[in-house]
């Protein structure tokens, strides 16, 4: 029995270490990336908002040769870590970056706005260095986050980060897609018709985003 227990522990410990080491969740799209045989027109990089888009509107991706590479809950530093595997190695013409919601939601601790912005800039730098055109998107509106109700001032923080992103985009001649202005309500958040939980878009919300993104491509 003792030998069996030691054997099981010997198997489980490496598995647990491997899972802990995959903080960026490289494994999420490893198989899908290996199956990409044609360079996509665009890779959409992001968090759960991007993650849910192909399920809400699969035709938008298939008809336009887009690939979704969003991972629920991720902050910008995680996206930056997996940027080579999930974007550069797929050789798209464009990368559409929608990032920052979970930084503001404090998924990895209290937000450092400059570091979050710097991670987004670094993704743009990596894209341009590899012949990929970055497209920057505003963080979509939110007034609170149901999984982290302690976070305050979400709407104002989103506006601040968006201003930084837009300024950088203009100064560097990068296209900027302003979802925020088109989707916000009088509170600076999302109306229920566009997001039942106040954060994740409904199909109607994604339709607004789709229209704006297609104009930029």
Question: Model-derived features: where do they sit?
Answer:
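Positively charged n-region of N-terminal signal peptides that target proteins for export
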Residues: 1-4
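Hydrophobic alpha-helical transmembrane segments of integral membrane proteins
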Residues: 10-11
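Serine-esterase "nucleophile elbow" of acetyl-processing enzymes
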Residues: 18-94
């Amino acid at each position: 029995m003792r030998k069996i227990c030691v054997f099981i522990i010997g198997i489980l410990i490496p598995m647990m270490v491997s899972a802990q080491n995959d903080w960026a969740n490289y494994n999420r799209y490893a198989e899908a990336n290996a199956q990409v045989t044609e360079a996509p027109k665009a890779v959409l990089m992001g968090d759960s908002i991007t993650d849910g888009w192909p399920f809400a509107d699969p035709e938008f991706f298939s008809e336009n040769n887009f690939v979704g590479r969003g991972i629920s809950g991720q902050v910008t530093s995680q996206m930056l870590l997996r940027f080579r595997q999930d974007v550069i190695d797929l050789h798209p013409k464009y990368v559409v970056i929608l990032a920052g919601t979970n930084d503001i939601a404090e998924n990895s601790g209290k937000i450092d706005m400059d570091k979050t912005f710097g991670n987004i800039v670094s993704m743009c730098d990596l894209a341009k260095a590899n012949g990929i055109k970055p497209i920057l998107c505003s963080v979509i509106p939110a007034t609170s986050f149901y999984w982290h109700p302690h976070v305050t001032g979400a709407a104002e923080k989103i506006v601040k980060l968006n201003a930084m992103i837009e300024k950088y985009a203009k100064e560097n001649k990068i296209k900027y897609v302003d979802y925020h202005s088109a989707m916000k309500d009088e509170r600076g958040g999302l109306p229920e018709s566009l997001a039942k939980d106040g954060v994740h878009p409904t199909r109607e919300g994604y339709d607004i985003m789709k229209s704006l993104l297609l104009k930029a491509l």
